[in-house]
A protein has these predicted regions:
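Low-complexity, acidic Ser/Thr/Pro/Gly-rich terminal tails and inter-domain linkers that flank the onset
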Residues: 1-28
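Long, contiguous binding/interaction regions
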Residues: 13, 17, 43, 59-60, ...
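Short glycine/serine/proline-enriched coil/turn segments at secondary-structure junctions
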Residues: 23, 44, 91-95
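Short, solvent-exposed loop/turn segments enriched in Ser/Thr/Gly
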Residues: 28-34, 98
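Asparagine-centered strand-capping/turn motif at beta-strand->loop junctions
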Residues: 37-41
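Short acidic, flexible loop segments centered on an aromatic residue
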Residues: 43-62
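Intrinsically disordered, low-complexity Pro/Gly/Ser/Thr-rich segments with frequent PxxP/GP/PP motifs
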Residues: 62-94
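Terminal connector regions
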Residues: 89-127
Length: 127
């Protein structure tokens, strides 16, 4: 097994526009994102912190760093998953998010799990 496969997490994302928490007249667009993190490696590892890069359609970038996710620093065994839901606000009807999770394996090895860019967008309404 390669080192790359020994230390690996996968991340999947589902997004949702929150119309009831948004106000287009105030340029306030609320979105939820549901994350599933899976330890696809061969050793147990703990998610320590996160780094998000949130970009709206105007190109405004907001970086968010913090410990854990939703108050937790989950320790995941191989093939174990952790799910959570969080949210963000944009000043435009659409934008994107991407980032990384900083992770430490039980043997002390530090690595990052990449969070591929995903889109946040107000659904189009057809009349």
């Amino acid at each position: 097994m390669t080192t790359q496969n020994k230390y690996a997490f996968s991340v999947s994302v589902i997004t949702q526009y929150l119309a009831d928490q948004s106000d287009a007249d105030e340029d306030r667009y609320a979105f939820a994102y549901h994350i599933t993190i899976t330890n696809t490696g061969a050793v147990a590892a703990q998610l320590i912190s996160r780094h998000w890069i949130i970009t709206d359609d105007n190109g405004t970038v907001n970086e968010v760093r913090g410990l854990g996710v939703v108050g937790a620093q989950p320790l995941l065994q191989p093939n174990e998953q952790f799910e959570y839901t969080s949210g963000t606000l944009l000043n435009t009807p659409s934008g994107s998010m991407r980032g990384t999770y900083q992770i430490v394996a039980v043997d002390g090895t530090q690595f990052e799990a990449m969070i591929a860019p995903f889109t946040l967008a107000v659904p189009r309404v057809l009349h």
